[in-house]
Amino acid sequence: MKLIKVTLVFSLLALVFVAQTEAQNPIWENWLACNRIGTKALASLLRETIPTVRNLLNCIDFNPPTDIGNSYLSKLKLYYELVKRGALDKTQCLIVPLKESVRLLRPYVKSLETNKCLGE
């Protein structure tokens, strides 16, 4: 008799969990679709980053010193010099990669908006 009660309880729990899983299935599918779009966008951006950074360094004509050290502050100064040259001296060098990034990400952002992934 005790075994029957336990079996009934587990059967009811299984039915509740299966019903709950089916109710959340569209939410899960939407979440997976949104993550798939985001992963593709990130992969595309990373794939284009290396040549873009190389072109940016060539455009700015920036040669980092060889003995910058391993400290955080020395690397911060190096990044500051790079951004300062790009922002103040050769602004076109920074604008072109930004425009390229916007062009690259535009279809992914539209897909995210279409699937209602943003703001939920």
Swiss-Prot record:
<protein>
    <recommendedName>
        <fullName>Accessory gland protein Acp53Ea</fullName>
    </recommendedName>
</protein>
<keyword id="KW-0964">Secreted</keyword>
<feature type="signal peptide">
    <location>
        <begin position="1"/>
        <end position="23"/>
    </location>
</feature>
<keyword id="KW-0732">Signal</keyword>
<dbReference type="GO" id="GO:0046692">
    <property type="term" value="P:sperm competition"/>
</dbReference>
<dbReference type="Pfam" id="PF06313">
    <property type="entry name" value="ACP53EA"/>
</dbReference>
<dbReference type="GO" id="GO:0019953">
    <property type="term" value="P:sexual reproduction"/>
</dbReference>
<dbReference type="GO" id="GO:0005615">
    <property type="term" value="C:extracellular space"/>
</dbReference>
<dbReference type="InterPro" id="IPR009392">
    <property type="entry name" value="ACP53EA"/>
</dbReference>
<comment type="function">
    <text>Responsible for physiological and behavioral changes in mated female flies.</text>
</comment>
<keyword id="KW-0085">Behavior</keyword>
